[in-house]
Amino acid sequence: MSVVKSDLTLFAIPKNFHGHFATIQRNAITSWTRLNPRPEIFLFGDEDGTAEIAGELGIRHFPEVARNEFNTPMIDDLFRRAEQHATSPMIGYINSDIVLTDEFSLAIGHLHKRHEKFMIVGRRWDVDWDRSLDFSQPGWEDSLRAAAGRANVQRPGNCIDYFIFSRGLCNGLLPFALGRFVHDNYLLWLARSRGAALLDISPVVMAIHQNHDYSHSQAFADVRQSPEVRRNRIMQDPGGISTRSRTPRKFCVKMERIGRIDTGG
């Protein structure tokens, strides 16, 4: 039986696999390995447990990634390394607590055939989940979707947990600190400024975020006032990057919302 090669490489940089984070990250990363066709998957960073789960799931692990003086990964180096090692035409950054199902593969495969240069994003659905997913059960996807549907918390457009893009689109990024605001809007602006189709698959893909606390970092309010956030905001100032809105703290771009995936033809 021949194996269909995926056109997608997913990459992530997990947090330490401690406590609840160990459970939800294992759930998420394992779900990626079950996509059909299975994507190439890279895990970056030397956080506790990353090497072990990479070995267990047959995932490539790259412990080295550039960090700032606060030990925060830098997106320019992270994205550069991912593209350097990827063998596929589509590359995607994803947060390591996001569970994906085959509707995701269907959507991006469809759009890849129709766009040469693109960035695909989507809003997440939040759900409280504190146990391991049983992937041996044929209905695991439906059970998780049902739980997310009951919670009925689809986050707004500023909560983007995955960015799927055509190869070469994200070359030469600015050195933003990962997870310190601004960089997600910057990626959207960059895609549009480079002539890419910006595609929102939220209506057709339920990307499920397993809720967690923020014990891995400073309190949310403290992070917003941190030197890293201030530095990120300075880099996105419109004096250096022109935006259509000229709004100093926000990149305004228009996205095409994908409301239906036609599987015929």
Please give the residue ranges for each predicted region.
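Conserved catalytic core of nucleotide-sugar-dependent glycosyltransferases
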Residues: 83, 99-184, 188-189
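Short, acidic, metal-binding catalytic loop of nucleotide-sugar glycosyltransferases
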Residues: 26-39
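Short, hydrophobic beta-strand segments that form beta-sheet elements in well-ordered domains
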Residues: 39-46, 120-121
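Short, solvent-exposed loop/turn segments at secondary-structure junctions
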Residues: 15-17, 47-50, 68, 97-99, ...
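A short, glycine/small-residue-rich beta-strand->loop->alpha-helix junction that serves as a flexible
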Residues: 16-24
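C-terminal catalytic/acceptor-binding lobe
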Residues: 2-4, 8-14, 176-265
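Active-site-proximal specificity loops/subdomain of glycosyltransferases
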Residues: 43-94, 101
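Well-ordered, non-membrane alpha-helical segments in soluble/globular domains
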Residues: 23-29, 105-107
